[in-house]
């Protein structure tokens, strides 16, 4: 593991994310319970953008693609030169990482595996819900003025994580009407575009530049 971690560290770019281009945010006000029910209906989605990781030990700035479906999730981190820093797949059997030189590493917990290989502490097991703005089993959470999730706190493996959802954007979602299987209805739903995760001195800033989703 230590050898791979050293190799992985060389691939990571030590660039601090100073700022990101602004994204127009025009979220609509929602009724929270109804909104949460709609979020839970989203079975397949993809989010892509930029991720900045800051800790006392390292600072990284990376591109990310997060894909989620009922049977599998995938997180891919790449440098700004296009090099793959992490290619993680999660399914019912556990987590698997395939490295740039085709080495394969597995673990029951995705979060543990990523930390062992890269040193990054990321609560990956909760990302499928947190990315969408669902307070998955949160110890506490707060809503903002538009009744979407503003913040949450969650104890994960004896570590207290706090999340803030700074911005939302209305995102198109295709859904089939019950009366006609071939009739596809396009509706919109506000989804997070700026998120921050904090645990002790570790901080993760995420900017989602593109959402792709469907029920």
From Swiss-Prot:
InterPro entries: LolA/LolB/LppX, OM_lipoprot_LolB. A lipid is attached at residue 20 (N-palmitoyl cysteine). GO terms for cellular component: cell outer membrane. Gene3D superfamilies: Lipoprotein localisation LolA/LolB/LppX. The keyword Signal applies. One of its GO terms (biological process) is protein transport. It is a lipid-anchor. It holds the Pfam family LolB. Keywords: Cell outer membrane, Chaperone, Lipoprotein, Membrane, Palmitate, Protein transport, Signal, Transport. Its main location: membrane. It is found in: Cell outer membrane. Transmembrane segments: none annotated. A lipid is attached at residue 20 (S-diacylglycerol cysteine). Residues 1-19 form the signal peptide. The keyword Chaperone applies. Monomer. Belongs to the LolB family. Plays a critical role in the incorporation of lipoproteins in the outer membrane after they are released by the LolA protein. This is Outer-membrane lipoprotein LolB. It comes from Vibrio atlanticus (strain LGP32). The gene is lolB.
């Amino acid at each position: 593991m230590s050898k791979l971690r050293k190799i992985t560290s060389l691939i990571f770019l030590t660039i601090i994310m100073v700022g990101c281009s602004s994204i127009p945010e025009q979220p609509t006000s929602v009724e929270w319970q109804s909104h949460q029910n709609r979020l839970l209906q989203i079975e397949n989605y993809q989010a892509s953008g930029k991720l900045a990781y800051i800790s006392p030990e390292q600072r990284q700035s990376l591109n990310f693609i997060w894909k989620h479906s009922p049977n599998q999730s995938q997180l891919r981190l790449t440098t700004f030169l296009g090099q793959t820093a992490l290619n993680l797949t999660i399914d019912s059997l556990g987590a698997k990482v395939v490295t740039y030189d085709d080495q394969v590493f597995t673990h029951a917990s995705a979060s543990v595996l990523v930390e062992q290989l890269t040193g990054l502490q990321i609560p990956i097991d909760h990302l499928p819900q947190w990315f969408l703005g669902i307070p998955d089993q949160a110890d506490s959470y707060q809503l903002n003025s538009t009744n979407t999730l503003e913040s949450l706190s969650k104890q994960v493996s004896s570590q207290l994580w706090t999340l803030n959802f700074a911005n939302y954007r209305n995102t198109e979602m295709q859904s089939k009407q019950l009366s006609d299987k071939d009739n596809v209805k396009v509706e919109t739903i506000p989804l997070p575009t700026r998120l921050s995760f904090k645990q002790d001195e570790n901080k993760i800033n995420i900017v989602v530049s593109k959402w792709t989703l469907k029920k």
